[in-house]
Amino acid sequence: MSAVAQPQQVPTSGYGIDVAGMDRAIKPGNDFYGYVNGGWVKATEIPKDRSRWGVFSILAEEATRRTRTLLDEAVKMDAPAGSELRKVADYYASNLDEAGIDARGLAPLQPTLGRIAALRNTKELARLLGEQLRADVDPLNATNFHTDRLFGLWVSPDMSAPTRYLPYLLQGGLGLPDCAYYLDASPRMADIRAKYQAHIAAILKLADIADGEAKAARIFALETKMARVHVSREDSANVLKANNPWKRAEFATRAPGLDWASFFTAAGLNKQPVVVAWQPTAITGLSALAVSEPLSTWKEYLAFHAIDRRAGVLPKAFLDERFSFYGKTLAGTPQLSERWKRAVISTDGALGDAVGQLYVKRYFPPEAKAQLQAMVKNIIAAFDQRIDHLDWMAPQTKVKAKEKLSTLYVGVGYPDRWIDYSGLSVVLGEALGNAERAELFAYHRRLAELGQPVDLGEWWMTPQTVNAVNLPLQNALNFPAAILQPPFFDPGATAAVNYGGIGSTIGHEISHSFDDQGSQFDAHGRLADWWTPEDLAHFKASGAQLAAQFDTYHPFPDLTVNGRQTLSENIADLAGLSATHDAWQLSLGGQVAPMSEGFTGEQQFFLSFGQVWRTKTREPALRQQIITDGHAPAEYRADTVRNLDAWYPAFDVKSGETLYLWPKDRVRVW
C-alpha cells in the first residue's frame, strides 16, 4: 500500500496570509470577508486624507511614495532643457511652489475668463465649448463617464470596424458625480445639493465675482436641467445603446440647438465624417439647452467651472473651498492630502509615461514579468478547458470563444512603446499653464490617432498604476508593474497565495472578455453577435441570477447594491476566480499543495482572494460608489466565493450559515 502524500509546511515570504488581520471568531460561512479581514478592519483607521483605505490604496500610496523619490531626484538633476526628465522635474516643482501659486492669484486664468466674458452669441458659445473639449472620458476601458465640461471626447477603435479610430462624444456638464445627485428627492441628496450651490457661490466670491448667490442659483438650475436629460450610469454602460455613429453633418438635425459646425471646427473635428454619439438622447438634450438657456447663464456657468476645476493650481483659498465640498461633503475625507502627494499625482497624470520609465527602471525586476507571464498562460489554458467542459454551449459558440481567448494580447509591467512628450511645453513656475497645456497635449495626441492604423498594443494605464484593465476593442489586457507586489504577488509565497491574489486579478481581467459587455465583442475587437440564440439566452439567465444575488446586498438601510450596474465586474470576479482555481490546481501537477501558516492549499487560495478585498470606506464615499460605480463594495466581492463548490469543504461551510447556497443556487457563468 503506497503512502499518502502529506502536505509540507513552508514559510511564506514578505506577506503570504495575514493571520493577524483575520477574525477567527467569525464563521467563514456566515461572513467570509469578516473572517478573513475582521482583525484588520478593527485595527485600521482610514488616514485622514483618504476616503477609503485598503489593499489597493495601500499599494497606491507606496507607488506614490516611490514616485516622489524619483521626482525629488529629478528636480536635483541638471537635466537638459526640453528633455523629458527636465519636463517631469519642472512640472513637479511648479506644483510644489505654493508661494508662487498664491502670488500669481487668478492672473494665469484671466485669459480664459476673459474669453468667457466676451461671448456675444450662441455661435461664439459653441466655438468656446468646442475649444474646451478634452479627452477626459473613457466609457469602456476605464468606465469613466464623468466630465464637468458639456461634452467629453474619447478616441478609440470603431466598435463596428476596429481597424480604424473614431471619435466618441459623451454627455457631461455636471459638477456633481451623477444625475441622481440632482434628481433624487431624499433629504440626504437635498442636503448635498444645498451645499453644492453654496460651494458655487463661495468660489465666485473668492474670485470677486459679484452677486455670487444669485449666479450660483442660476448655475445650479442649469446643471439640474442637464441632469434631467442625462442617461443613467447603468444605461451608459450598455455598448449596444452606445454604438451610434452619426455623420458629422447630421448633428444639426439629430441634436438641434448647438451650432455644431462651429463646435466641431473649434474642437478640431471638422474633417471627421463620423462622430459616435454615445448617449444620443443626452447629447440632443444638452444641445437644446445651448439655445434655450440665457447666454448670460452659460457665461456664469463656464466661469465657475473654469475656476473650480483649476482650484488645485490656484491660491490656497480656492483649493480649500473645493476640498471642503468635494473632499469633506461628497467623500467624507476630513483632511486635504499633503501638497507633495497632490504634486506627484498631477505630474503622473500629465507625464505618466515619462514617469513610468523612471519607475520601471527602479522598481520592476525582469524576473517578476516572466513569472507573471507564466501565470497568465496557465490561467488562459484553464479558461480554455472550462470552455471545453461547458455542457450548455454549442460547438460553434465554443470555437468563437476559444478563438477570442487564443488571440488575447497580454501586456505585463509596461508598454513596448512610450508616449513621446517632445510636443509638450512645460514652463517652470507655471503650474496652471502646465496643467492646461498637458490636457491639450493629451487631447491633440488622441486627435492625431484619427486616420492612423490602430495600435493593438497601446496601453491605457501607466506602469505606476495599481490596477489592471481589459481592452475589449483591442482584445488585450494590461497589468501595470505597480500591482505586481504583495499581497497580490509575492515571489516567495506559495502558489496558492499567488494564484488567489494576482491570479484572481488576472482571471478577472481575462473574464472581462466574456462578461455581459465583453462577450459582445469578437476576437477582432468588433461588436458582433457570435452566440447562438440558445447560448445567449442561457448566458443572460446566469447573469440575471448573479445580478439578483447582488441586489440582495444592503450596505445601508436606504441603499442597495445595483446588481445590473455591477454585473460586468461581478461576472469577471466569479468567472476569473473559477478559472484561476482550476489553473492553480493544474499547476500542482498532481501533488498535494503545501501547508502554510497552518492552512491547507485550498484555504490559502481563498484566504488570499478575500485578503485582496480588505477595505474601509467612509460612508459618503461608499454611497457615491454605489450610485456611480460599476464595482460593488469590496466586502461583497470577497463573498463571490460562495458560488464556488470548492470553497464549501475548504472551510466546512454548512447549510444554515448565512452565505450558504444550495448547489442549484450557485451561479455558474463560465
Q: What would you call each of these model-derived segments?
A:
Residues 8-20:
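Short, Gly/Pro- and small/polar-rich lid/capping loops
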Residues 74-378:
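Noncatalytic, helix-rich "gating/capping" subdomain that lines the substrate-entry/channel surface
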Residues 3-7:
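Boundary at the C-terminal end of the N-terminal hydrophobic targeting segment
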Residues 225, 254-257, 269, 276-280, ...:
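Intrinsically disordered, low-complexity linker/terminal regions across diverse proteins
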Residues 10-11, 26-103:
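Active-site-surrounding "flap" and adjacent substrate/cofactor-binding loops of secreted or lumenal enzymes
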Residues 49-71, 212-229, 498-504, 602-605:
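Short secondary-structure subsegments characteristic of cysteine-rich extracellular domains
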Residues 22-42, 182-204, 393, 567, ...:
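Hydrophobic/aromatic-rich, well-ordered segments within soluble, folded domains that form packed cores
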Residues 43-47, 154-156, 178-180, 230-233, ...:
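Short, solvent-exposed loop/turn and secondary-structure capping segments
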